[in-house]
Amino acid sequence: MADKFNILLLNGPNLNMLGVREPEKYGTLTLAQIAARLDRRAQALGVSLHHIQSNAEHELIAQIHAAFGNTDFILVNPAAFTHTSVALRDALLAVQIPFIEIHLSNVHAREPFRHHSYLSDIAVGVICGLGAEGYEYALQAAVNRLNKS
């Protein structure tokens, strides 16, 4: 059976260090463990999920551009690029693919410089502070939205 929808998951800088990086803020699961959980959930939902993690802004932008015309939804944890990247914002605006912004920690309960996002106002929604489960909620929300369209 062909997958009904194609979803792209982008993970930004330092998320490759999950599991060892500040576990009190980000939890003990590795990105690979989170991805495996999401793959199982995507399979159960009948959608195709493609994962990319990069510490390089230009690589994430290239993936967003490549998604044009073949991706139905984007899930993105921009990590530190949330607060700095007009370029990611512009790439997402250019392709006009709906997306949900995800953060493991509650960015609003952290340092003031983390309170501003260049993506939130153009996102379908934002999930933050719910740990690794936030990815699963975002995936379900994306599928729900796509099924309504």
Curated annotation (Swiss-Prot):
Going by the record, the broad EC class of this enzyme is: lyase
Q: In which pathway does it act?
A: Metabolic intermediate biosynthesis; chorismate biosynthesis; chorismate from D-erythrose 4-phosphate and phosphoenolpyruvate: step 3/7
Q: What's the Enzyme Commission number for this chain?
A: 4.2.1.10
- InterPro entries reported for this sequence: DHquinase_II, DHquinase_II_CS, DHquinase_II_sf
> Does this entry carry the keyword Amino-acid biosynthesis?
yes
Q: Which reaction does it catalyse?
A: 3-dehydroquinate = 3-dehydroshikimate + H2O
Return the annotated site residues (Transition state stabilizer).
Answer: 21
Keywords on this record?
Answer: Amino-acid biosynthesis, Aromatic amino acid biosynthesis, Lyase
Q: Where is the signal peptide?
A: none
Q: Catalytic site residues?
A: 26 (proton acceptor), 103 (proton donor)
User: Do the record's keywords include Protease?
Assistant: no
UniProt record, GO biological process = amino acid biosynthetic process; aromatic amino acid family biosynthetic process; chorismate biosynthetic process; quinate catabolic process
The family database entries (PROSITE patterns) matched by this protein are listed as: DEHYDROQUINASE_II
Q: Which residues of the sequence carry a binding annotation for substrate?
A: 77, 83, 90, 104-105, 114
Q: Which domain of life is it from?
A: Bacteria
Which is an annotated Pfam family here? DHquinase_II
Q: Which GO molecular function terms does the record list?
A: 3-dehydroquinate dehydratase activity
Its function, per the record, reads: Catalyzes a trans-dehydration via an enolate intermediate.
> Which family is annotated?
Belongs to the type-II 3-dehydroquinase family.
Cite the record's note on assembly: Homododecamer.
Record's protein name: 3-dehydroquinate dehydratase
The coding gene here is aroQ
